[in-house]
């Protein structure tokens, strides 16, 4: 661990520059460009002197109207969820076919492997090793009817077709261009975008651009055994390194008379990550209920040491000398802390659930005939038939939305929203120039419980609901 701490010591000035807030004009320019590229011209990001940046409406929104669809900067599907759902590793859209989705799930279930879809994963989580919103996701069933292995294999391999699945077409899976067996895609464009943005450094395949595939494998195993948020932090670092290399190459191509300092190129490459509010992970993570307050110091040191071990493995795997400041523990801790404070659950509804609901809505005679074929599969899946894709992601614009216990907007996936983008919908009419707010917590909780939860985010809520509740105590 010494080398990680030495990086913090030797690159203290560079680390401080990376973690320094962007000047307001640069921040405004960045978000203006982002809003233009997202084509969401009904909003703007503005800095408020008292609460920092926020999202404001520059046009009126009606109740249930779409405010924003925000693309992911970095996101992951939870490791445990990969046995339940085969999705594109870049946009998180379901891929393959209804038959393949059902076949994979039953195959892993027959092996005794199931996803542990726990959104509140901790450093002690045991996640499945895998090779190859407000919406409610399906739970797990302790018992199920096992189908013959040959039937399951036929489903997975496309040798068996179920009735009416043509109504639910899915993109064919494309393998990772680097040759790993972990990443699959819905299209060539998603495969290329993921490769260029981060996966080329994080791929474990033969064409990986990492400097040690063995160390990368150890890093991934450590993350899967402890907390898969490390995989997301690795994506942020790989994203910045690759962006730095691209900016440097473009600068060389321009044959500029004056060489651009490496630090300014690194700061520019880091900019998309720099805009998120940050605190060190071990400082901002909520104290678990089963940890005695007297043990808080030891708990937070344990979290810090866990991050240090993870970073050491990542550094061996993808280290870049020109971007060495990125491999400081201070940077790593702040990246993960940014996710802790800003991330939104990544949820994509399963087309398998839609398929069985479609069967259930068929006319009685046709339904009875169809269910003679489909019912054994539904029974074998149990409650897990409706499992959705679950993960976590950082969304640049959504992360700027401030909290209110009486919010005027919410994250909500509509029927047509079939990928990992964040979808923000108006809960009521929103006036022009009004701030767009969402709730970070369950706003129906009692006042003191709300304030305790929000303290983990580093603020005390003073929305109209909290002011009213506090006056009655």
From Swiss-Prot:
Interacts with JMJ30. Binds to ARF7 and ARF19 in the nucleus. The gene is ATXR2. The lineage of its organism: Eukaryota, Viridiplantae, Streptophyta, Embryophyta, Tracheophyta. It is an enzyme of class 2 (transferase). One of its GO terms (molecular function) is histone H3K36 methyltransferase activity. This is Histone-lysine N-methyltransferase ATXR2. Histone methyltransferase that methylates 'Lys-36' (H3K36me) of histone H3 to produce H3K36me3. Promotes early stages of cellular dedifferentiation through H3K36me3-dependent, and to a lesser degree H3K4me3-dependent, activation of Lateral organ Boundaries-Domain (LBD) (e.g. LBD16 and LBD29) genes. Positive regulator of root organogenesis including lateral root formation as well as adventitious root formation from wounded leaf tissues. Recruited by JMJ30/ARF (e.g. Keywords: Chromatin regulator, Metal-binding, Methyltransferase, Nucleus, S-adenosyl-L-methionine, Transferase, Zinc, Zinc-finger. Zn(2+) binds at residues 176, 180, 199, 203. Signal peptide: none annotated. A zinc finger (MYND-type) spans 134-203.
């Amino acid at each position: 661990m010494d080398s990680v701490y030495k990086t913090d010591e030797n690159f203290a000035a560079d680390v401080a520059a990376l973690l320094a807030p962007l000047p307001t004009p640069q921040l405004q320019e960045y978000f203006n460009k982002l809003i233009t590229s997202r084509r969401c011209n009904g909003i703007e990001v503005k800095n408020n002197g008292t609460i920092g940046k926020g999202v404001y409406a520059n046009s009126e929104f009606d109740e249930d109207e779409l405010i924003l669809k925000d693309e992911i900067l970095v996101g992951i599907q939870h490791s445990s969820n990969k046995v339940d759902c085969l999705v594109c590793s870049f946009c998180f859209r379901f891929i393959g076919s209804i038959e393949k989705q059902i076949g994979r799930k039953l195959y892993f279930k027959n092996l005794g492997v199931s996803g542990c879809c726990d959104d509140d994963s901790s450093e002690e989580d045991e996640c499945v090793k895998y090779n190859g919103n407000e919406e409610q996701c399906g739970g797990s069933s302790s018992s199920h009817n096992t189908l013959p292995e040959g039937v399951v294999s036929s489903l997975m391999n496309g040798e068996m077709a179920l009735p009416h699945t043509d109504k639910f077409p899915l993109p064919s899976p494309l393998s990772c261009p680097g040759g790993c067996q972990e990443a699959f895609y819905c299209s060539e464009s998603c495969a290329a975008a993921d490769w260029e943005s981060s996966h080329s450094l994080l791929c474990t395949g033969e064409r990986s651009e990492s400097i040690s595939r063995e160390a990368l494998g150890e890093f991934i195993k450590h993350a899967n055994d402890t907390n898969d948020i490390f995989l997301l932090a690795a994506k942020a670092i790989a994203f910045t390194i690759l962006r730095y290399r691209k900016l440097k190459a473009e600068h060389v191509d321009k044959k500029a008379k004056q060489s651009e300092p490496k630090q300014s190129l690194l700061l520019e490459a880091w900019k998309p990550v720099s805009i998120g509010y940050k605190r060190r992970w071990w400082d901002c993570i909520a104290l678990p209920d089963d940890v005695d307050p007297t043990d808080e110091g030891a708990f937070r040191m344990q979290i810090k040491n866990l991050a240090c071990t993870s970073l050491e493995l990542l550094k061996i795997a993808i280290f870049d000398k020109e971007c060495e400041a990125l491999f400081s523990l201070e940077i790593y801790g702040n990246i993960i802390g940014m996710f802790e404070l800003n991330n939104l659950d990544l949820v994509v509804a399963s087309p398998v659930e839609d398929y069985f609901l479609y069967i259930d809505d068929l006319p009685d005679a046709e339904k009875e005939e169809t269910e003679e074929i489909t019912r054994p599969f539904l029974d074998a899946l149990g409650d897990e038939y409706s499992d959705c894709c679950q993960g976590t992601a950082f969304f640049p614009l959504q992360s700027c939305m401030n909290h209110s216990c009486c919010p005027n907007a919410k994250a909500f996936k509509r029927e047509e929203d079939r990928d990992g983008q964040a979808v923000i919908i108006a809960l009521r009419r929103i006036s022009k120039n009004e701030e767009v707010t969402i709730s970070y917590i369950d706003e129906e909780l009692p006042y003191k419980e709300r304030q305790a939860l929000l303290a983990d985010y580093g603020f005390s809520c003073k929305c109209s609901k909290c002011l009213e509740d506090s006056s009655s105590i």
